[in-house]
């Protein structure tokens, strides 16, 4: 990742944080069960799951390309996930009509986030290309993911920043 891109991404995060007024907020309002950090974490995972669904279906939400495609979005199901610090977060997991969507960031029937998902974001932040990340995940974890999925995941995270 170039220094210019790192600066731009840092600026986006700083702009987002500048919009928040932390003055007078209690610890519970920031880090508690329904606190700001938990809400941001939930939104972060939901963005990634929606990017995964876009990749799975081959089109973005509300895109006409999905008309008569044989499979489409079919709402959401609520899921409680256990985070790295053993706290929990509620997230909305997208569903498809054919029930063929297999999320990678939080797999079906799993309540914990796999390590490699944190690795995608970490490797991307260190400047690795989508293809490099794809190759690394395959070699180290035995996980096959498309470069397009990695691209969608990182784009979704940046949009939410």
Language-model-derived ranges and their functions:
Residues 70-126, 145-147, 151-155:
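Basic, short loop/linker segments at the boundary and entry of helix-turn-helix/winged-helix-like folds
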Residues 55, 124, 139:
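Short polybasic/polar patches that bind polyanions
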Residues 1-77, 83-85:
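Subset of Sec-pathway N-terminal targeting signals
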Residues 26-39, 102-107, 114-118, 137-139:
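Short hinge/gating elements
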Residues 41, 45, 116-117, 129:
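Hydrophobic (often cysteine-bearing) scaffold residues that line and stabilize catalytic clefts
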Residues 60-73, 129-161:
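Electropositive nucleic-acid engagement tracts
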């Amino acid at each position: 990742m170039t220094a210019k891109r790192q600066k731009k991404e840092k600026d986006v995060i700083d702009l987002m944080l500048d919009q928040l007024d932390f003055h007078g907020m209690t610890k519970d309002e920031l880090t508690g069960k329904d606190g700001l950090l938990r809400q941001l974490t939930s939104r972060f995972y939901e963005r990634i799951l929606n990017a995964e669904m876009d990749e799975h279906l081959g089109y973005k939400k509300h895109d006409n390309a999905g008309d008569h495609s044989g499979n489409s979005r079919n709402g959401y199901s609520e899921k409680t996930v256990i985070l790295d610090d053993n706290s929990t977060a509620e997230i909305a997991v997208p569903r498809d009509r054919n029930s063929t969507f297999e999320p990678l960031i939080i797999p079906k029937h799993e309540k914990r986030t796999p390590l490699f998902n944190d690795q995608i974001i970490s490797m991307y932040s260190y400047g690795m290309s989508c293809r490099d990340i794809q190759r690394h995940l395959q070699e180290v974890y035995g996980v096959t993911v498309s470069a397009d999925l990695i691209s969608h995941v990182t784009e979704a995270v940046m949009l939410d920043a």
